[in-house]
Amino acid sequence: MAIPVNVKKWIDENREYFLPPVCNKLMQNHQLKVMFVGGPNQRKDYHIEEGEELFYQVQGDMCLKIVENGKHKDVHIKEGEMFLLPGRIPHSPQRYADTVGLVFERRRLDTEKDGLRYYVEGTTEVLFEKWFYCEDLGTQLAPIMKEFFSSEQYKSGKPDPAQPIGKMPFFLNTEQVMEPFSFQNWLNKHRLEINQKKRVSLFGHNQETKAVVYGSGESKDSKAQTDTWIWQLEGTSCVTLGNEVLKLGSGDSLLIPEKSLYSWIREDCSIALSTSQVPA
């Protein structure tokens, strides 16, 4: 049964999970993972996955450390900013106290592998890494980190010749990442276009992340091939899902399960963000 969730209220009710040692809480955990992350959480490990990740800073700033084309780079995502990280780029989120960030990622395909990697300090030489099929990142990372901290590589700060780094299951992405941008400024700039076209994509059609802002209008008998998360930003709308009629007010969210048939009526002055991730 689909149930609308008010985002602000949900964040306030779950703030205890945004503190160490947990630092995150999943709002939705299906084909689409919708999670909120807090801090402080400073880390040395880098995560690598084949899919994209979408970041939006709800409260406070964060720094996303990445390795872009063989060079370390800090991507500073400020409060209210959005950033789409392409797949296959090593990344290490650095979060601070009293911050809350929204992160989207998707369920992995059966053929996909995730990696956890540590670098030799100050370089891009791989010190230690493990590849695994990701089912629950929150529980799977801890044993790998524990293995690293008890390893010869951690003690010496150098790769262990007895444990050579194996071949990666895929090539790293060589594209240059985008600059984070203010979501509110984007909305203000595109309001006229949203009113005229009824829907405007944030990232175009070449990415697996489909983030679309909808204005007033109606979507009849739509088929959700993957999970779709709706966030009603302004005004109201009404979603008919099976025999259920669900009303969304400002700040409410709703997950439409994959392979569902639904209709969506958006009233005048309605602004809503629809997010889904379709594996490439």
UniProtKB/Swiss-Prot annotation:
Sequence segments annotated as region (Linker): 161-177
InterPro entries: 3hydroanth_dOase (IPR010329), 3hydroanth_dOase_met (IPR016700), RmlC-like_jellyroll (IPR014710), RmlC_Cupin_sf (IPR011051)
Sites where the protein binds O2: 43
Cellular component per GO, a single term: cytosol
Positions with a binding annotation for Fe cation: 47, 53, 91
Classification via Pfam families: 3-HAO
Pathway recorded for this protein: Cofactor biosynthesis; NAD(+) biosynthesis; quinolinate from L-kynurenine: step 3/3
EC number(s) stated in the UniProt entry for this protein: 1.13.11.6
Main location: cytoplasm
Function: Catalyzes the oxidative ring opening of 3-hydroxyanthranilate to 2-amino-3-carboxymuconate semialdehyde, which spontaneously cyclizes to quinolinate.
Protein name: 3-hydroxyanthranilate 3,4-dioxygenase
Lineage start: Eukaryota, Metazoa, Chordata, Craniata, Vertebrata
